[in-house]
Amino acid sequence: MKILHVIIGLQKAAGTSVFCGEVANGLVAMGQDVTIAVVNPDAPNLYPLDERVELVSISSILTTNHLTTNDYNVVHIHGLWSPVLHKASAWAKANEIPVVWSTHGMTAPWSMRHKWWKKFIAWHLYQKCDLKNAAIIHSTTALEVEWNRKLGFENPQIEVPLGSFIQKESAVESRNTGEALKVLFVGRVYPVKGLMNVVRAADKLKDVNIKFRIVGPDQAGHLSELVAEAERLGVAAMFDWAGPKYGDELSIEYDKCDMLILPSFTENFGATVVDALSRSKPALASTFTPWKILEERKCGWWVSNEPEKLAETFKKIAALSAEELEAMGKRGRKLVEEKYTWDAVCTAMVRGYESVLNHGIH
């Protein structure tokens, strides 16, 4: 099977890049022929790809000459709102190649409202029609399937989560009595991630031995807003702003923490939760994320991201013993082994592609 993935960029920090890159890597390992088309294949900090994955520019794809030498079975488009992705969709339709479209959480109500005036125009010009024309819409959670249905899409949908590699269990010793509870956030430093609520929760935790480490790139100048608020509240010493980390450096961050937080106002999936659980670290996620299973499997907390509720929950967590946290982490690792490996994700995506081809859906 020859599969063409189309995505604006493959920057390491983006969840869309992780999914596209790891699915591509997994597919070529399974013997599939995979090409990824991006706006700029020479951009810095691209997600690492298997050498068998061909990386090209989108502009080079949208030509008749390219198609005559590359007879793709499926075009898999990642993300929304870009005229470039619209052109790729139109190109696939003109050449009768079925499209699988991953919405990657961008149809979430919060996301649809954010900069709505720009999206309103794009929605009615091309995006709604493009999604209706997709052979299959790919969602990573049941919640995302629901979002897409509420927007009126009756296309077949497949639910395939983001995956994770099962990591070696941390060799770092557990927190000793009297040591600070080390709480890690990994992701973009951006308003939707809910970090301002964490800073304000810290104001209610001044009598708790707790340290927050924030790992990820600043976006839209939000980091300076968080730092200023932490200083205003007198909690600056409770925060480490570490900037982006990748590869081994990021693995060390997970190893050193006691738990992960995902306090977002909206989250299609939240791959960092899986990354933490795979390392036997429990996680706290907001009820705006699809992580109720943390409570169901007793490997974390699923709570409101209001500062008061966060503070209340952190006080309870800080009172837990190292053994109790370790037991939660081990249950989380077992959950990942059952449900969230990249091998399982890639197998599910192949089944999705095959369903398109076997039923002649265009």
Residue spans of the language-model regions?
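A short, active-site helix/loop in glycosyltransferases that binds the activated sugar's phosphate group
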Residues: 130-156, 164-166
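A conserved mid-protein helix/loop that constitutes part of the nucleotide-sugar donor-binding site
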Residues: 17-22, 181, 185-204, 224-225
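Short alpha-helical donor nucleotide-sugar binding micro-motif in glycosyltransferases
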Residues: 244-245, 252-257
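Short hydrophobic beta-strand element within catalytic cores of glycosyltransferases
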Residues: 282-286
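Conserved acidic donor-binding segment of nucleotide-sugar-dependent glycosyltransferases
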Residues: 301-308, 316-322
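Aromatic "clamp/platform" in nucleotide-sugar-dependent glycosyltransferases that forms part
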Residues: 265
